[in-house]
């Protein structure tokens, strides 16, 4: 079993005056996401990879109240399963690791530098609309909207254009967060250029090369989801023929 090093040995990993340090960025991002309505009721999560360390927001902490000392740190790479084998090198004694951990690891194993999980209402709504209109295997698709240009075509392939069709895969929710890992990885394998996966009736996972890219992609997607819901109300198709 991997040795679990408790927090009082490695507090230095989350102590920094640098505002760009992951232990400072994660609480700041969580406060923003809370204010935007993305992570209410302690839901959602954020994780950042810096070199061979992964910094992860804990489970059960109100996002607007999160502090650097609440952050978990993992050695990377690390096993996803079983949880007891994960290489924690900084583990707050009074908190639980995020249930999103194996899903974040799936993104990091594919080269991401940051992964964001939100419970955005707009993300949830578009998964329901797609299910109603296209069935359980449908994708979220939208075209001819300026904000699509904020989403990458794929790693190293530049950004989507105005006339391109954005396609985001949707997976089914499960009773426990960690049980989403297999279907998330399958969606990643089948859609290697995607930077996001929607979870029906739940939310979305978005990842990027770094914090700025993951954040701006998440913002662009949420804008597009809200716009899509409003377009649907007006009878305007998401994909222009």
Curated annotation (Swiss-Prot):
EC code(s) of this entry: 4.2.1.109
Catalytic residue positions: 146
Pathway as given in its UniProt record: Amino-acid biosynthesis; L-methionine biosynthesis via salvage pathway; L-methionine from S-methyl-5-thio-alpha-D-ribose 1-phosphate: step 2/6
Catalytic reaction list: 5-(methylsulfanyl)-D-ribulose 1-phosphate = 5-methylsulfanyl-2,3-dioxopentyl phosphate + H2O
Keywords per UniProt: Amino-acid biosynthesis, Cytoplasm, Lyase, Metal-binding, Methionine biosynthesis, Zinc
Entry's Gene Ontology molecular function annotations: methylthioribulose 1-phosphate dehydratase activity; zinc ion binding
Ranges of biased composition (kind: Polar residues): 1-17
Record-listed Zn(2+) binding positions: 117, 119, 202
GO cellular component, one term: cytoplasm
A Pfam family of this chain: Aldolase_II
Residues annotated as binding substrate: 100
Cofactor annotation: Zn(2+)
Enzyme class, spelled out: lyase
GO biological process: L-methionine salvage from methylthioadenosine
Subcellular localization, as worded in the UniProt entry: Cytoplasm
Record region (Disordered): 1-21
Domain of life: Eukaryota
CC cofactor note: Binds 1 zinc ion per subunit.
Function: Catalyzes the dehydration of methylthioribulose-1-phosphate (MTRu-1-P) into 2,3-diketo-5-methylthiopentyl-1-phosphate (DK-MTP-1-P).
PANTHER family the record matches: METHYLTHIORIBULOSE-1-PHOSPHATE DEHYDRATASE (PTHR10640:SF7)
NCBIfam families (alphabetical): salvage_mtnB (TIGR03328)
Family membership: Belongs to the aldolase class II family. MtnB subfamily.
Descriptive protein name: Methylthioribulose-1-phosphate dehydratase
Organism ancestry: Eukaryota, Fungi, Dikarya, Ascomycota, Pezizomycotina
Chain's gene name: mde1
């Amino acid at each position: 079993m991997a040795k679990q090093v408790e927090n009082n040995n490695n507090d230095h990993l989350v102590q920094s005056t640098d505002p760009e340090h992951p232990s400072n960025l994660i609480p700041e991002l969580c406060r923003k996401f809370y204010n935007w309505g993305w992570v209410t009721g302690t839901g959602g999560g954020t994780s950042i990879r810096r070199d061979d360390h992964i910094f992860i927001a804990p489970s059960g902490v109100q996002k607007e109240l999160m502090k650097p000392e609440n952050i978990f740190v993992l050695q990377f790479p690390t096993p996803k399963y079983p949880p007891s084998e994960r290489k924690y090198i900084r583990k707050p004694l009074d908190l639980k690791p995020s249930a999103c951990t194996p899903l974040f690891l799936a993104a990091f194993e594919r080269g991401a530098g940051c992964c964001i999980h939100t419970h955005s209402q707009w993300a949830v709504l578009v998964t329901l609309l797609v299910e109603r209109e296209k069935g359980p295997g449908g994708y979220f698709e939208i075209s001819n909207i300026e904000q699509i240009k904020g989403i990458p075509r794929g790693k190293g392939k530049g950004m989507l254009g105005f006339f391109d069709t954005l396609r985001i895969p949707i997976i089914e929710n499960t009773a426990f967060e960690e049980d989403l890992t297999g279907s998330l990885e399958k969606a990643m394998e089948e859609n290697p250029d995607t930077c996001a996966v929607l979870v029906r009736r739940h939310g979305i996972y978005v990842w990027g090369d770094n914090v700025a890219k993951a954040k701006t992609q998440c913002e662009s997607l949420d804008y597009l989801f809200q716009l899509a819901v409003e377009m649907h109300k007006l009878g305007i198709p998401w994909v222009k023929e």
